[in-house]
Amino acid sequence: HVLEVGVFFGSSLRMWQDFFPHAQIVGLDSFKGVQGYMCRPEDKWCNHGRTPGQRLTFDNPESFLQEWRSGHDASSALSRIQLVVGNQSDSADMERVVSELLPFSPFDIIIEDGSHLNGDQQRNLAQLLPILSPGGTYVIEDVHSSLELGYDDPPGSADTTLRVVEHFNQTGVLHSRHLSRAESHSLQRSMRSVECVVLGLDRPMYKQSGACFVTKKREKGGGGAAF
């Protein structure tokens, strides 16, 4: 079972369905597009009857799904894909989302690729790690937000996601202004290891990108996740 937080316009759903041909895939998003986002000529997800400069938003998950499968033979894959509506930045809404995700859990892989805000990355980890399989992998994508301006913490400061997990790897202690004490302690008990990779990019939008891979502890006497 695979969960992706932050579906954007669906290209990654198609990638996961191809990469994991037997997996059940759940996509979590508001499915409203990105506020103010305009299609660009290089945006492949805007090619379904859209033109550059046109705003791309969706009224509901059904309209998103219709757009997503437009021009593609996705009938066989649709039975493996479920969509859940939620706001990753709203802690109360995420409590509801976790309850809605329980029938699909535990997940073997969770990919968080939403707002890229440090606070959302860390709170979502605390909220969703309990429904990850023991030994499973939780991926925090686009951790360049820890290093660049324009996000919710100064670049490289102590509460950015990269610095928080670096401190955890060095000390076994996880502390951040974005997490409650209970959330921090719960993560410390559940996280076995974190490995991060950051790469330099030659792109106008991002100068660097990267991801952190969190491995959840295995239960005593239990097996790991099956990929």
Which residues does each predicted region cover?
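S-adenosylmethionine/decaboxylated-SAM
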Residues: 1-227
